[in-house]
Amino acid sequence: MLRHATAYLAGLLFALTAAAEVVDITPAGFLLKHEVAVNAAPDAAWKALVDVASWWNGDHSYSGNAANMSIDARPGGCFCEKLANGGGVSHMTVVFASPNTVLRMTGGLGPLQGSGLAGSMTWRIIPAPPAAKIEVSYSVGGYMQGGFDKIAPAVNGVLGEQLNRLKSLIDTGRPAAPK
């Protein structure tokens, strides 16, 4: 498990994606935003979004396998990951779910989980007939040793990669290859 956690952190720190945008970094936290157009109606985009195991890159997981990841898209639901030893990881908690339009979760992904942070990630699916747009924002605040200047761009890269994989899944039936 330590090997996977180390690989997860290394990937998180070095992944970069062109579609990523760091909106703001301050001593108190950071804000990330991304947007893509997809060739699907909002209901199909929602179905793909909540089937996280089909598009998340397993290199950015503790188990090393995206098939172990799930999102229970209802208030109180979990963005969770099963571990081989019978354990698991609660990456985020669903606090708002409006099918086909908004999914909001709170928590810290990866190494952010072990720091004194609060995070809010919002996925919006916006009709853009005949298809849709997907917007994701992630706001993180609190205390992090060393500050946010290095970690925010890395988290941004990983989030951008995941959004690109989701877009590829929706548009082509297959997630984009890992970078």
PLM region spans:
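Beta-strand/loop substructures that line and gate deep hydrophobic ligand-binding cavities in soluble
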Residues: G110-G160
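Bacterial N-terminal signal peptides
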Residues: T6-T17
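Short, highly charged C-terminal tails/helix-capping segments
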Residues: S168-K179
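Short beta-edge strand/loop motif at the mouth of beta-sheet-based domains
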Residues: V52-H91, N100
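Hydrophobic ligand-binding cavity/cleft-lining segments
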Residues: A18-A66
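Hydrophobic pocket/interface hotspot
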Residues: A45-A48, F79, V94, M105, ...
